Structure formats: structure tokens, C-alpha cells
Amino acid sequence: MKWHTHVIHLCIILFFVIGYGSTSSAESKSTSLKLPGSVINIEKENTMPQAEENLSYLQPSDFTKELLETSKVKIDNPNLIKILNESAINKSPFSLGMRATIYLGEWPLSYKSNGTEPNWQYQKINTNFYDNRQGTANYQINYVQEAQKSIKGGLTAKVPQVEDVQKMILLSAMEKTNLPLTFETVIGRGTKHHQVYNIGQGQLGYLYTYAPAIHEKGKVTYGEVYLVIKGTKRKIDVKNVTSQSIGAWIPLQGHLNFGFQGSS
């Protein structure tokens, strides 16, 4: 009777584990990216306030660490880690004869970065212009956003479970650059900045505004994940492992790049 009760309890736990979906994470080394002087933080001035990406690496529990160490393939996926953190399979003496292999699904397991490069002129979003050819003195202009602009990034290739992969890449890029990155940001109409640019007498003045972005390149690894139980022993087994090259453009949130040009 006790054995029957234990089997029911274990089945409930395993059903709970299987019932979850999948998502992503990242590995990376912190190498802060220095912003050029032409890139200015306009977060406070933006008339369309943006919520910061609330991403952080999920720490595995002791139980999860034990499982991850049994896997021959590196696993960084925070959703998979979350599922393992929230599950528990007790080492009960009644489980000595228990054997089970549970399929947890195919997951993006990890992302490895091969390069991170900035493009400070990723997307032109605004031009402020003044004609001072008939002027009798210098004229000063400053940045004023004339129309609302949405800046979007994305992956450079089609891959399974896009949202999971994007999250892993984003985590990696944010850790490497120490910059506020997001796959979509908005600059509101009427956003201004106080920095002035002088248009000389007899000249035309153009103030170009660009949204900067980070270009990330690397490799994402997929695999079928199984939870294997043999008595009191538990392990993760990953089968049919595949890797795919991937890239992504990730806009820099709350920052703009300014370029001024004067001509006769």
C-alpha cells in the first residue's frame, strides 16, 4: 500500500515537471563597451518612457545543480532551470526499485557568443535642419524628435523557439557590454536634448539622429532533454544535440547617436 502511494506521488511530481514549456539563457564574459562621445543618454527626456528589461541569470537550487552536473551538455536555459528548481524527487527508501525516463521536451540549451560589435548608426530616426544662409550670425539648434519612432531588432536567421533564443542572446549581450539592451524600444515625439550645435553664418545645418544597436554573433545549442530516475539516483540525459549559427541586432535602450553637418 505504501509502495502504491509512493508511485502515485512520484507520478504527480513528474507530470508537474513535464507540464512546463521552454525558454532561454546565456554564457558570456563581462567586457564593458565604451560609448563614443556622440552617444547620449536621453532616457529622462524620452516622452515615451520605456520599462527596463528585467533579466537576470536564475540561480539553480542545490537539487538543480546536482542534476545539471550529470548532463554531458551544458545547460543555461533559465526556464529549464526554473522548472528543475520548482520540482523535487525525494530519495525515499521506497524508490530503490524505481526506474523511469521522462521526456522533458526539446530545448534551446545554451548560447555561446563569438562576437559582439556596436553599430552606432543602426537606424536613422530624425533630422533637424536650419537654413542660415541668409543669417547675420551663428544659429544654434538642438535635437527635437519630430515623429515617434519604434526601433526593432531581431534574429538574423529563423530558428526554433525564437523567444527562448532571443532571451539567451540578450542575457549574454547585456552581461558582455553592461549596456541597457532590448529588442524593441520607442523614442516619443517631442523628445528633446539641451546640447546645442552651431550653424555658421551663410550655412545649412543638419543634425542627424541615429538609434544605436549591438550586433551579436554566436551559436545556439538544442537538445532533447530526459530526466532519468534509477532508484535514488537522478540525472539529466540530453540526446540528438544540434547546433546552429545565429546572429541578432539588439537596440540600445534610452541612448541616441548624434551627427552634425554644416554645408554652404
Positions of the model-derived regions?
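Membrane-inserting effector segments that mediate pore formation, membrane fusion
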Residues: N138-R189
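Short acidic DE-rich linear segments
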Residues: K2-H9, E27, I151, K158, ...
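A short, flexible low-complexity segment enriched in Lys/Arg and Gly/Pro that occurs
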Residues: M1-V7, G135-Y139, Y143
